[in-house]
Amino acid sequence: MIQFTVDERKRLRERSSLYPDTIQRLKNETDEIFHGEIIVPKSGIANWTLYYYCPDCSVKLKFDRTSPHRHRCPSCKKTFTGEPYDSSWWGLINMKNYEAVFSMAVIWLATGEQAYADKAIKIMKEYAAFYPDYEVHGDIPYNGPGRAGAQTLDEANFQRTFAM
């Protein structure tokens, strides 16, 4: 699938100079993943991200991409370990990765900065290496199972965003 023709890419690059704030916002949003270590699960262990909340005060846990096994509530300051928090953390990692890959591709299309394309490609290659062996999981009949996510819809978003 060709998302943009050569002429469309050329026009996009020409027009992107008119919107430096937008390009900078995309760079800021991808900064942690662009400059950080590539974190991709070796097995399909992602769970529902709705579990990533404090069971005591219902506040979303503070996400730290470098802490897959310790999850802290910003309100009551409790730290949670184990399931369902660890696998929900992986679901969030997968989501943040595919969103960053898409944004990095847009940055590259708009600016020609090859480093963004290179990082996006590296992340996608990491997934390509492990995704075929991700276990299909989830047994809610009306949702369908997932691999990189908790359900079929998560899976569709994951793959669609990479394909774009």
Regions inferred by a protein language model and the residue ranges of each:
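Extracellular glycan-targeting catalytic surfaces
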Residues: 1-164
